[in-house]
UniProtKB/Swiss-Prot annotation:
It comes from the Bacteria. HAMAP family: AcetylCoA_CT_beta. This is Acetyl-coenzyme A carboxylase carboxyl transferase subunit beta. The gene is accD. It comes from Synechococcus sp. (strain RCC307). Signal peptide: none annotated.
Length: 291
């Protein structure tokens, strides 16, 4: 049997992968916390930044809610919102990539997995990109990379700090090398931004993995994370099989990374806006000259 025949036979016999089920969050009026089981009135949950008041569990939120939580009301100005991905490789696995894109666009109302623009946090200007895990797992394709790169370049020209809210499964395999190229492209734009002594803050949310972790998620001047966020490159099972040893229970969590020096601060979502405003203000102030 040839290698190609072996792969063809494996496709026929391999069991379909089951997607990880989303937590049961109710029918729109009530939401059940997957951590403590508390049933909460959804309006109260949203008013608390989608954080469980009983146990502090951070529910997954979409890009629109993230912008509402972080920015001053009415201050957001979208950038490059018209960019849409194509299918340059005519990629098809169990389904055509073009079909997956159409489904994600219809279900989320987004063109791709990131929303970019400028706004203000307590009156201070900022350029920000918010990744949305609902769109193909927040995967980074050519359009995601292009939008983030353009945003950073705009911020460099306008002397603005940059905030990227990361929520991604990594590079988008359906775009092959075009997806992997975005890691270097975004990193290059960040280096030019850094050379102008401008502030860059990545906010790592659950989950941040793969090529996003291996590039712009870990290049910040200050690296922030939400509590208990999953942050890593390869999956836990792959690492355990490679090392042939059991990993700690809290491995690849925000707390584990902070203990090992990879995350500067873990900030609850309810405090993010005020803490970011303080950081922006401190960065804008000239360094004090001691007498």
């Amino acid at each position: 049997m040839s290698l190609l025949d072996w792969f063809a036979d494996r496709r026929k016999t391999a069991p379909a992968l089951r997607p990880t089920p989303e937590p049961d969050e109710g029918d729109g009026l009530w939401s059940k916390c997957p951590e403590c089981g508390e049933v909460v009135y959804r309006k109260d949950l949203i008013a608390n930044a989608s954080v469980c008041a009983s146990c502090g569990y951070h529910h997954r939120i979409h890009s629109e809610e993230r912008l509402r939580i972080l920015l001053d009301p009415g201050s957001f100005i979208p950038v490059d919102g018209e960019l849409s991905p194509t299918d340059p490789l005519a990629f098809k696995d169990r389904r055509a990539y073009a079909d997956r894109l159409r489904d994600s666009q219809r279900q989320t109302g987004l063109r791709d997995a990131v929303v970019c623009g400028t706004g203000t946090i307590e009156g201070q200007g900022i350029a920000l990109a918010v990744m949305d895990f609902r769109f193909m797992g927040g995967s980074m394709g050519s359009v995601v990379g292009e939008k983030i790169t353009r945003l950073i370049e705009t911020a460099t020209e306008q002397q603005l700090p940059v905030l990227v809210v990361c929520a991604s499964g990594g590079a988008r395999m359906q775009e092959g090398m075009l997806s992997l190229m975005q890691m270097a492209k975004i990193s290059g734009a960040l280096e030019r931004h850094r050379s102008r002594k401008l502030l860059y803050i990545p906010l790592l949310t659950h989950p941040t993995t793969g090529g996003v972790t291996a590039s712009f998620a870990m290049l910040g001047d200050l690296i922030l994370a939400e509590p208990k966020a999953l942050i890593g490159f390869a999956g836990r099972r792959v690492i355990e099989q490679t090392l042939r040893e059991k990993l700690p229970d809290n491995f690849q969590t925000a707390e584990y990374l902070q203990d090992h020096g990879f995350v500067d601060a873990i900030i609850p979502r309810t405090q993010l806006r005020s803490r970011l405003a303080s950081l922006l203000q401190m960065h804008q102030q000239p360094a004090a000259v001691s007498a």
